[in-house]
């Protein structure tokens, strides 16, 4: 195999597929990036058996073939080469010569035939969403997935499609994030759980442009994201997602409308002297139209405590200038939501002692 391409194109491609290279594996071939130039395009692929990414880069094929190269070594070499044309040539025993101007690197590769290809997925009836919308939905929900594997379902997000509405849900046992968007077309009801790791990596690759679309394809075991010159294939998390409907309520005793930025600044100041790792709650005292800053409130006075990080995480991803907070009592969850409920954040309170 012999190909040539610009450094900028190769760096971009390697950066995209490297997100699917495992950090630990007992299979050395999975630590590689496959360069496939067996057809008329140059395709880079990485696959950790749970997440696979494939992207096409611009370039010229002088001699068709394929080679698998160690991802870390290959990435380091490519990034440090001059900003010019790079030539990659593989020969006997998979020895590979990488040349750019006066720089030359000779590294050992592996047979492309041994590489674990992405599973074949029939791409029919795609769900189309703008890259901007999907990137935003992930940003506004991903922070409340669980960060450990004690409950696998909590490490993913529910994609609940019904008609022309897509609802994305995440939870970690202390909070729930829900984001609803309207789709351009109507689809059959479908519920799947997508790994949080997959969504984080997809979000990094998405351009975020409103006029560029990403197409989603679903099977019983996989989800496919197809956009630009890239395809991401991920295994789904098995199992039935949590029934959150019984935790959601429109009843409230106290409603507060507040400037989001002012509340964030207030929480930031209140936690200024709290050491990182200390589990001290922030106490919210709502009384006589006051919450230590100007608010509009309806209903009963209230004294309630929350983990400040959970409040900050939710408020930071809300784009509206003002936020509505709904409370029932000091033992019930707080809801942050807009009137149309395009977003809903549920946060459980924490116990505290002492007068405020």
Region spans (language model):
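Structural preference for solvent-exposed beta-strand-turn elements
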Residues: 1-356
């Amino acid at each position: 195999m012999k190909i040539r391409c610009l450094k900028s194109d190769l760096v971009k491609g390697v950066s995209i597929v490297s997100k699917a290279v495992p950090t630990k594996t007992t299979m050395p071939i999975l630590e590689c990036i496959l360069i496939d130039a067996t057809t008329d395009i140059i395709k880079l692929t990485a696959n950790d058996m749970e997440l696979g990414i494939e992207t096409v880069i611009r370039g010229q094929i002088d001699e068709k073939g394929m080679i698998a190269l160690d991802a870390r070594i290959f990435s380091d070499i490519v990034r440090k080469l001059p900003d010019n044309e790079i030539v990659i040539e593989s020969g006997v025993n998979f020895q590979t010569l990488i040349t750019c101007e006066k720089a030359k690197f000779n590294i050992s590769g592996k047979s492309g035939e041994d590489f674990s290809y992405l599973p074949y997925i029939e791409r029919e009836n795609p769900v189309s969403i703008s890259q901007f919308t999907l990137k935003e939905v992930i940003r506004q929900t991903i922070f409340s997935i669980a960060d450990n594997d004690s409950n696998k379902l909590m490490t993913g997000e529910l994609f609940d499609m019904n008609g022309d509405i897509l609802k994305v849900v995440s939870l970690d046992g202390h909070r729930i994030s829900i984001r609803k968007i309207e789709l351009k077309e109507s689809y059959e009801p479908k519920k799947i759980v997508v790994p949080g790791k997959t969504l984080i990596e997809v979000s990094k690759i998405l351009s975020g442009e409103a006029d560029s679309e990403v197409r989603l394809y679903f099977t019983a075991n996989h989800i496919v994201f197809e956009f630009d010159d890239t395809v991401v294939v991920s295994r789904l998390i098995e199992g039935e997602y949590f029934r959150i409907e019984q935790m959601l309520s429109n009843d409230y005793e106290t409603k507060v409308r507040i400037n989001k930025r002012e509340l964030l600044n207030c929480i930031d100041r209140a936690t200024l002297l709290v050491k990182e790792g200390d589990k001290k709650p922030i106490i919210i005292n709502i009384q006589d139209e006051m919450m230590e800053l100007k608010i509009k409130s309806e209903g009963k006075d209230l004294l309630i405590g929350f983990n400040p990080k959970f409040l900050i995480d939710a408020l930071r991803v809300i784009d509206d200038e003002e936020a509505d907070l709904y409370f029932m009592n000091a033992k019930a969850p707080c809801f942050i939501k807009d009137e149309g409920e395009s977003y809903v954040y549920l946060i459980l309170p924490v116990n505290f002692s002492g007068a405020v």
